[in-house]
């Protein structure tokens, strides 16, 4: 978005300074979106070719990794959820998690090649996308066992055109996985998830409904955790972590880990939303 704004402003200034006035500035603003998207398509091909050697190396390295692989996507709270999952599981296991902003094929492959080692027991990958096929391609060599979708929102709507398209692009993370953890308060996502239940384990995590597989209630800095309607335990933390905690519990269920023990021994996650 930042690059696009620069492009729009630059073209508009040129139009006005050249004496063509408001009309050409308006036309420039409209067509700059098209020019920007075309530029992205061109650079995307270049980036893909340039990064293939790193992807091949990362895929080979991952092929020898025997632990569970978790992939996370969504329109919001990806980094917060990744950090929360990593922090909770790290109390009992050695966790590899991609660094902040390393969520495309080059960033993910680079972090694998440089930082993943034989001592790691669980790997967590955050995945972003600007269009169709990107997450599917990353999953083809990351091969996640558990996929997490934090929610769908009108981010990059000018490029993706509709929420349904955003949902389809994010849902590519489900194709090769066996278990899916979703934000059960997102109606669009929840409806889509009903199509997955025949072939995959789907765990819906909610901050509003006790009918969900996982429900996290918040009051006075306390998150009360319910599984299948039954109170399990509670943890301290700010309200902005409520969804991330719910999704983390969903992941712990999928991993068949001791939820009470892990949450009890884990320090409060960082209060950060991404």
Regions found by a protein language model. Name each.
Residues 149-266, 270:
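Acidic, Mg2+-coordinating active-site environments of NTP-dependent enzymes
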Residues 8-199:
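Phosphate-binding loop of NTP-binding sites
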Residues 1-5, 264-273:
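Conserved small/polar residues in nucleotide/adenosyl-binding loops
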């Amino acid at each position: 978005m930042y690059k696009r704004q620069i492009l729009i402003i630059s073209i508009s200034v040129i139009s006005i300074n050249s004496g063509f006035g408001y009309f050409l500035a308006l036309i420039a603003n409209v067509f700059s979106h098209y020019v920007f998207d075309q530029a992205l398509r061109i650079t995307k091909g270049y980036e893909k070719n340039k990064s293939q050697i790193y992807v091949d190396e990362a895929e080979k390295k991952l092929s020898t990794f025997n632990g569970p692989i978790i992939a996370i996507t969504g329109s919001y709270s990806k980094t917060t959820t990744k950090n929360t999952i990593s922090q909770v599981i790290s109390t009992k296991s050695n966790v590899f998690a991609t660094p902040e902003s390393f969520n495309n094929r080059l960033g993910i492959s680079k972090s694998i090649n440089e930082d993943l080692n034989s001592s790691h027991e669980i790997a967590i990958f955050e995945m972003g996308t600007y269009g169709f096929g990107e997450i599917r391609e990353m999953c083809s060599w990351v091969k996640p066992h558990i996929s997490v979708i934090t929610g769908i929102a009108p981010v990059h709507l000018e490029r993706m055109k509709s929420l349904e398209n955003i949902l389809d692009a994010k849902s590519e993370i489900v194709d090769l996985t066996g278990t899916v953890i979703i934000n059960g308060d997102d109606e669009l996502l929840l409806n889509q998830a009903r199509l997955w239940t025949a072939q995959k384990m789907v765990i819906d995590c909610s901050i509003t409904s006790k009918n969900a597989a996982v429900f996290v209630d918040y009051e006075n800095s306390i998150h009360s955790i319910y599984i299948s309607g039954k109170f399990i335990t509670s943890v301290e933390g700010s309200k902005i972590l409520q969804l991330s905690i719910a999704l983390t519990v969903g992941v712990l269920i999928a991993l068949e880990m001791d939820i009470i023990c892990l949450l009890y021994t884990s320090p409060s996650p960082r209060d950060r939303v991404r």
